[in-house]
Amino acid sequence: GGSQCGFCTPGIIMRLEASKDLLAHMCRCTGWQTINEAVQVRRGEVVLPQSDSRDLVAAQKRAALEGRATQVVGPHVALGAGGFADDIAPTNSLVAVPSVAGEWFVGETTADARRAAATVQGRKSSLSVTYPVTFPEEFAHVSFAHTLQTTWVEPAYLEPDAVWCEPHGEPVGPLLNGGAFGGKSKTSALALELQEVARRLANQHQRPVRVVLAREDVVRRSPKRPPMALAVRSDGSGEVWVARTSGLVDIISDYAPKWLIHEIDVDGPATSVDVRATGWAEVAVMKSSVSPETEWGDYVVSPEGAQAWARVDDSGIHIRVQCGLVLDAVVLRSYCIGAAHMGLGWVRSEGIAVNESGEPVDLTIRSFGVIRAVDTPSIEIEIIDNDGPSINGSDAVFAAVAAAAWRAAGFPSTWPCQR
C-alpha cells in the first residue's frame, strides 16, 4: 500500500526516515501514511498477519477503479520501474521543451533545450488565492444555511507530462501509470498536442525525441478544478454558480436534480470535470452540512453508489467505506488514505494564485498547498466488504472527508480556510 503511481517512492526509500525527513519529498497519491507503514514493516517494527499469496491481478483491477486509469501494482513500481514515459525513452533521444510563448526548442539534453528556450524556473508567488465566482448582488444569504466559495485547485500530479516518439513511429505517453486524479487524459488537448509535437520533431530530426514539460509548464497548461460559489438550504436544496466548464452542468444536475446551476465566464486557467469528483463532490459536501451527523460522521454517496463516512477530530481522520467487492484491501485502503489526505487539503490549504490576466502564478509543487507529511494527521480506514459490483470508493472518501473537515472547522465560507 506504500506505492500507487510509483513516481515519488525511489527518493523516499533512499531515506527511510521519519515524517520530518520527508519534507524534501512529495507524495500526492498515498497521503504519506502507507509509506511510513511500509517502512515500519520493512524494518521489522510492525509484523503483518500471515496470509495467502496476494492476487496482483485483482490488485490492479482495484487500482484501475480507484485511479480511473491503467495502474501497475508490484514491488518494482516502488523502486521506480512503473513505466513512466520519460523513464523508458531511448537514451539517444533529443529533448524538446516549450518556451513561455509556446514555441518548441530541441537540444541534446534537457539543459540544452531549456537554455535555447530561455526558460526560467517557476516560483511561488506572493499573491493570495482569489474567489472569481461570486454570488450575485441580489443574492439573499439569509435564506440559506451555509454558503461556500472555492478557488482554482491544481491536481498536483507529480510526474510532469512527457511523451517520446521514434521517427515514423507512434508517440508513447503521457499516461502510462496512475490516473493523476483526472489531471491527465490520453485524449486531452494537452496530451494530443504533446503527442503531435513528439511525432513531428522525431520525423523532422530523424532521431527519437522526448517532449518534456517542466513543473511550471504543467501548471500553465494543465486543467484545474473549477472555482464555484455554492449555497444550501436546510432542506438540502440549493444553488451553485460555476466557472463555465464543459460537462459540469450535466454532472451536477444528474447528482442533484433540484439544485439551480448558473454558469459564469471567468478569466483563468483551463478547467476540467475530469479532476477528481468535480461538481458532485462540492454539492455532496453542501448537502452533508445540513444533514444530521451520523454515528460515523458525515455521510456521502457517490454517483456510482459508493458509500463513505468520515469524522475529523483531534485524534485524526476516521473513515468507513463500502464500494462493492474489495478485490484487494491493501490497494483500496491506500487509495482511501490518499483521498482523505487530498480532501483535507482541499478544505484547509490547497489552491493556486492567479494574476489579473488569468494566468497561474504559483508555479512550484510546494506552492499548491498540499499538506506535508509532518502535518498529516493519523487516518483510520474501515472497509465494509460486500459481494456487489466493485466500484470506485476513494472519490466518495474524498468528498466525505472534505465534508467532515468543513464541519470540524465550523463551516467557513471560503476554501482553503487555513491558507
Q: Where are the language model's segments positioned?
A:
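Cofactor-binding beta-sheet edge motifs in enzyme active sites
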Residues: 3-6, 25-419
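Zn2+-dependent cytidine deaminase-like catalytic core
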Residues: 1-22
